[in-house]
Amino acid sequence: MNHQFRTSAPKAYGLYDPQNEHDACGIGAVVNISGKADHRIIDLGKQILLNLMHRGASVADEVTGDGAGILFQIPHEFFLEELDRDKVALPDRGAYGVAMVFLPREDEVRWRCETLLESEIVASGLRLIGRREVPTDHSCLGEIARACDPRIFQFFIHGNGLQGEELERRLFVTRKRLEHRVRREIGEPATDFYVASMSSLTIVYKGMFLAPQLAAYYPDLSDLRVKSALAIVHQRYSTNTFPSWRLAQPFRMIAHNGEINTLRGNINHLAAYEKKMSSPLLGQDLSQICPIVEPGISDSGAFDNCMELLVRAGRSAPHALMMMIPEAFGPRYHISTDKRAFYEYHAAIMEPWDGPAAIVFTDGRLVGGTLDRNGLRPCRYVVTEEELVILASETGVIEFPPQKIRQKGRLQPGKMFLVDTVEQRIISDNEVKGKIVRQR
């Protein structure tokens, strides 16, 4: 492997500090309101990404992108057939998780990482039932991306009776403990190790790409058996950062356009409270997953780390976002008494993650978008007569005949747009926040 290029940012040197990394990007989401999984959703996600290519960037060779990726629901039927070739029987949908893992190319280091992964799976009361090396086509990559691309494997993890949120929580703890253990026991040689996703609901395909290279690199994304009811995409523009495989988005729950200007304070606040944190759902596991924020991660990655913790501790994704990106709620702003009380209460728990931000997010069921309270990044939406919703940094990422458009608009500062694929409907900002601020 050519160590001139790495999958992570370089160490602090001179005036450069990786802690100051930000990026400005293109984001998008597509969802079938009915919740029906279809390969068309994957194709639409790829099309959105292609039409956001101008919001991304390339490095000096002009064929290595800053990063692109797609997040979608686990394609159960696809994996069922793929693993059947190796005589591996998957359990029912939702009864297992899939870890999408970037591994170092050095055989010995990769073997050590895999050994630790299997050890942590067993320690969590789960069971590794199969693995699959993800098919990739390196010929589409630029020299820089090709020199540092990892080996990419999918690990299939039996829930041993756990499903739903319980399994998601167990997989979250397993992943965090694994990450800490790899850093502690292997260290620098395992810099290229990264778990892009470990979930029973969603999976992330991403890398150091320009938008057209994503589907070319991952043939899975062109397989008609790969189906989903939702997809989130991201094209990265590293304004003052180094491109890397691990910092490509989407992360595990979000794709983010903008920058978190309060990042250092947010990370310090989390670190200060880690010893005092408690959770009836996470219990003693909480002490094993700290630090919450991965070392060397970007501002978007740190945001995702925090949001993931809040969701796994029992809050809904919209609730977590309301805590992290509150609306303007000072005395001059006209909001309900309940909502103001909610924001004032949570202000004592969570420092706002302030800065220009447009975020699309999903927990595998809900899909939505939100803006920072100043509305400093754009997010537009389209609802079609075919029950499709498109959220993106700009209009026109997918063209529809005017007669097929039921509704279109833009997100307002601090507001949220939400689709529930189980209830099969769009939920307004007032409704979702009204329920959250009144719940006990």
Q: Where in this protein do the model-derived segments appear?
A:
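Conserved short alpha-helical segments that host acidic/polar catalytic motifs at enzyme active sites
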Residues: 2-440
